[in-house]
Amino acid sequence: MGIHHLFKKGRPVISFEIFPPKQTSTIDTIYDTLDGLYDLKPDFISVTYSAGGKGASDHVTCDIASIIQNKYHITPLAHLTCVNSTKEEILQNLKRLQENQIENILALRGDIRPDVEPKHDFEHASDL
């Protein structure tokens, strides 16, 4: 379901935002968090790309959004950042999201990492 439909229901919309686990953790660590959030019955859960552009690899946001949608039956909102991605990487991420039937995407510029030269295919989220 498109998240915009939730705001037409005439009631407050409840959502949560989660961060993918760092590289030192496995995706399994997210289940405890999702189990607790499920009990609160949110309308949707957004999944960040990763704080500061560090941490999880690019597929983890999609993997978690897919788990939210298919295991917990909650609408996911996947973040998609562009400042540290090439056009090809963005297209791969969009294809992965589409293959997993993730309909809601929040386009963001993302954080510039001081230790990584930014890629210049997309300077701003509006370029996506």
What is each residue range found by the language model?
Residues 25-29, 82-96, 127:
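Glycine-rich anion/phosphate-binding loops
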Residues 32-48:
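Catalytic domains of carbohydrate-active enzymes, especially glycoside hydrolases
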